[in-house]
């Protein structure tokens, strides 16, 4: 979850898990409702489209509004990550280590994000890929030019 202030994106919460969809869907719905997220992009490769539809239905059933887009990614993941890394470094702000619990989704996310190597050999690239999808979503919906305060997110 990114709270947006102008062109600054504060990453305040994440859902970072390898759990199956029966566990992940309700967790994501709760996260959307708890944070009042209003825009989300879900990668629709490998069943993500159905996942996105289910999350959208569950959020709507709670009478909440969140634009949930399902979009496939076709470009090379490593190339996309490297292309957006400068934008992420410039615009994204993360919680300090003492602001999240050790062993939490946020902790695992930060470890995965900060251990990514641009030379390759990355077994676990979900965290940088998630941030890349956030950057692409921001570009897609044009938030960089918009100074409204919003909350946007990305999920896999």
Q: Where on the chain are the PLM-derived regions?
A:
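Conserved beta-strand -> loop -> alpha-helix junction used to position metal-binding or nucleic-acid-contacting
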Residues: 61-87
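Short, surface-exposed amphipathic charged segments that create phosphate/polyanion-binding patches used
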Residues: 80-91, 108-116
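RNase H-like, metal-dependent nuclease domains and their acidic two-metal-ion catalytic environment used
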Residues: 1-71, 96-156
């Amino acid at each position: 979850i990114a709270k947006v202030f102008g062109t600054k994106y504060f990453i305040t919460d994440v859902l970072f898990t390898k759990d199956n969809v029966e566990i992940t869907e309700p967790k994501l719905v709760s996260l959307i409702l708890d944070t009042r997220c209003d825009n989300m992009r879900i990668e629709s490769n490998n069943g993500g489209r159905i996942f996105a539809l289910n999350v959208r239905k569950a959020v709507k059933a709670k009478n909440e509004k969140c634009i949930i887009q399902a979009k496939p990614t076709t470009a090379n993941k490593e190339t996309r990550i490297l292309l957006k890394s400068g934008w992420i470094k410039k615009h994204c702000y993360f919680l300090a280590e003492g602001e999240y619990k050790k062993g939490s989704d946020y902790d695992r996310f930060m470890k995965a994000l900060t251990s990514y190597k641009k030379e390759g050999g990355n077994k676990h690239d979900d965290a940088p890929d998630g941030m890349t999808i956030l950057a692409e979503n921001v570009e897609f919906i044009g938030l960089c030019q918009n100074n409204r305060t919003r909350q946007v997110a990305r999920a896999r």
